[in-house]
């Protein structure tokens, strides 16, 4: 593979995470405006975003097999067409059914693109380099989470319709579409280069179960937390701009943390540092949830920084549970994380309706505690140490 081709594929991976980050994170900012647009209460409107999350889940789950049937380049180009149709549907329709359909399509496109992005990184890089590359790739999720709430706040404050936020997000996919030209993708399935060595099937082990539960609880906790921070902050008397700044600060700190940990992680055992970070994140979220508005800005910055490496380290450890990284295993852990995304409003919507936004934030805190327990238990069964020893010889 040429260096320029590797760079293009790496940038497609970066932007695939930015696309998903923008679509998922901007929800909390635009939800109130979309609820007004359709004359629905916010708690009811949040349920329609489950279509976005369901699209992401289904596409990541199916793409473990689709990648071997449909070429990756074809998937990305077809995704561009679907993206245009979905954004057009949001802009020109006043129907809630069409809105839900467009959200589902956006989810499908986002899930396919992100699973391709993750696969490309695990395919091109090995060992600890894979972990740091995945972490840097995931930082684009956070970068989008910092930039797009600011864009949304800017547009909404000037009474520009909410659907223009999604048009701006569509520009990320335009960049992915352009990068597919003159770029060679790894061949999979029947098109993959044949080798004489027999393919050895490995059992995944119980460590994959612990990692999958951790991925689900982490994403459900994170998105359950960040989706309701704006409503919680407004309930404490903050303006929409200040609430948006809290969300942007979280993702800015998350992004900086990812860049820092992409270097720091090289010097530590992944399972041990993951356990420490999960414990710290649970404590810091509790400080935010029970603290005063004066301390919220600092606690959310600290939470963003120390939780930044958790999800990517879970995926990296998942890929290291077998000698040869398996696309199906990586996609399985990703799928569990995406189930967390899909359940975000299914779980938190009724909690907010009955007990208010702070109850949703405390629920998220409990989920972070579960992540800590899973990471601690992983220490007794993880295979990543023996596989790292084998690859280093």
UniProtKB/Swiss-Prot annotation:
Q: Which domain of life is it from?
A: Bacteria
Pfam families found in the cross-reference section: MFS_1
What organism is the protein native to? Shigella flexneri serotype 5b (strain 8401)
What is this protein's name? Protein TsgA
Q: Does the keyword Cell membrane apply?
A: yes
* InterPro entries from the UniProt entry: MFS (IPR011701), MFS_dom (IPR020846), MFS_trans_sf (IPR036259), MFS_TsgA (IPR023528), MFS_TsgA-like (IPR050375)
Subcellular location field:
Cell inner membrane
> Which Gene3D superfamilies does the UniProt entry name for this protein?
MFS general substrate transporter like domains
List all membrane-crossing ranges: 11-31, 51-71, 78-98, 101-121, 134-154, 162-182, 206-226, 245-265, 273-293, 297-317, 332-352, 361-381
